């Protein structure tokens, strides 16, 4: 079996700001106890330490470019990617997760990849901003996007000689 994946739309929690929700989500995935003191955290077009704030800046830019506020529906997306126990090192898993995020977002959305080693199976959490880097649009979660993530993950696993 190749890596199992899941695509999850992240929404704003009631009683919390979008910024606070983003901070909670990024803090969880970057937890030093789960990522060997942050050793297995990488990012694209943002700093992992300030990703929540940088995501918010892009959302504000969207408001300015489009002359309207974003609906408070999906604030970010999370991809979970789990590997069979003993199949991959945390460093390799982080590289595979980064490649999955880069290819899925086509480099148009900032993201953070955190590889967790606190369970028997190594797994990645990828959070990418729902707003494009240039502030022009939001990610469109198409009908088969979860299947597209799984197929792309399978392809990357095969390219990296991981088991089928």
What are the functions of these language-model segments?
Residues 1-164:
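N-terminal nicking endonuclease/strand-transfer module with a His-rich metal-binding environment
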